[in-house]
Amino acid sequence: MIHKREPAAYMDVLLLADESEELIRSYMKEGDFYAITVDGRTAGGCVCTSPDESTIEIKNIALKEAFRRQGIGKAAIKKIEALYRNKGKTDVIAGTSNSSIENLLFYQKAGFRFHSIKKDFFLSYPEPFYENGIRGIDMVVFHKKL
């Protein structure tokens, strides 16, 4: 289901969750990349970083359209949580855009709670982006105890 891999070959998947290739390249170096597979096929990918000793941050998680709404993303999160819990992490955080309605639902259904808002976070992106007719401006940060 999740397999540690070199992220460069999965840029197309990571771009599904983050519009800035430049930013993806910067945080890919900071953490671990996991390919999410189903029956040997690449379904998606996830980049995890460690902002501090006790916390894991899901910097980017994305599934290809054909694999969405089947419980695969939630199962991948559970595997990642177990992996890092076994490494001594106690908390997991994840951020998404204020305009990413599906992601806001996804994280809550996966047991995350609202934690904070990073105002104007996405204004630093090279190009503005819109989802659901809403401009992505603020980052909504979610938290979950492991």
Q: In which residue ranges do the predicted regions lie?
A:
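Short hydrophobic/aromatic beta-strand or adjacent loop that forms the aromatic wall/cage
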Residues: 31, 136-141
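Conserved acetyl-CoA-binding loop-helix of GNAT-fold acetyltransferases
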Residues: 63, 69-82, 109
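Short, P/G- and charge-enriched loop/turn segments at secondary-structure junctions
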Residues: 21-23, 126-133
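Conserved beta-strand-loop-alpha-helix junction that forms the acyl-donor binding cleft
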Residues: 94-104, 115, 119-125
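Conserved GNAT acetyl-CoA-binding A-motif
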Residues: 84-97
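Acetyl-CoA-dependent GNAT
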Residues: 1-65, 118
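Short acidic/polar active-site loop segments enriched in Thr and Asp
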Residues: 54, 90, 113
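Conserved active-site tyrosine of GNAT-family acetyltransferases
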Residues: 106-107, 112
